[in-house]
């Protein structure tokens, strides 16, 4: 079970794990953001990376067993779809006091190690996670060409304990 990194009083059950989360309604406009990229050090804004086809925003972290379980498939899918013009960006909003392995330096090390083909951004204030109603990792948001939410949820049915890759 992944730890929650946001709090909201309006909760609904999230099917990916035992963590409850709110759900950004389908059709919602993507919340704008400008966050530091832990790999290259520059600031990334949503409007600068958004694709005219689709944009995938992922809330992940280094320590979550669910993220670790899907990392290989995530990299494979991202490489495949980036080649087709789909934009990908990952964001970590974890509290580094409680999870020091999720700090910016460790994020960069992890991104290089697993060969993330997308920016890995650090949301220190957790304001971006709150704007997206993200509550656990991994959490995936797919926005259409107009940055309207088309999908929110899990990558697939796999999890560390079910034997599905």
Functional labels for PLM-detected ranges:
Residues 1-15:
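Short, basic, low-complexity termini and linkers enriched in Ser/Thr/Gly/Pro
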Residues 2, 16-165:
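Chalcogenol-based redox active-site neighborhoods
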């Amino acid at each position: 079970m992944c730890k929650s990194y946001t709090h909201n009083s309006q909760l609904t059950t999230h099917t990916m794990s035992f963590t409850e989360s709110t759900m950004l309604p389908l059709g919602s406009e993507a919340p704008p953001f400008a966050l530091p990229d832990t790999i290259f050090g520059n600031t990334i804004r949503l409007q600068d990376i958004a694709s005219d086809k689709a944009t995938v925003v992922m809330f992940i972290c280094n320590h979550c067993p669910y993220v670790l379980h899907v990392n290989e498939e995530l990299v494979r899918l991202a490489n495949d779809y980036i080649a087709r013009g789909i934009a990908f960006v990952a964001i970590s909003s974890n509290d580094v006091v409680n999870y020091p392995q999720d700090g910016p330096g460790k994020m960069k090390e992890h991104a290089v190690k697993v060969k993330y083909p997308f920016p890995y951004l650090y949301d220190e204030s957790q304001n971006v996670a709150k704007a997206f109603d993200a509550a656990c990792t991994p959490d995936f948001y797919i926005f259409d060409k107009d940055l309207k939410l088309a999908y929110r949820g899990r990558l697939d049915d796999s999890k560390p304990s079910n034997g599905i890759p």
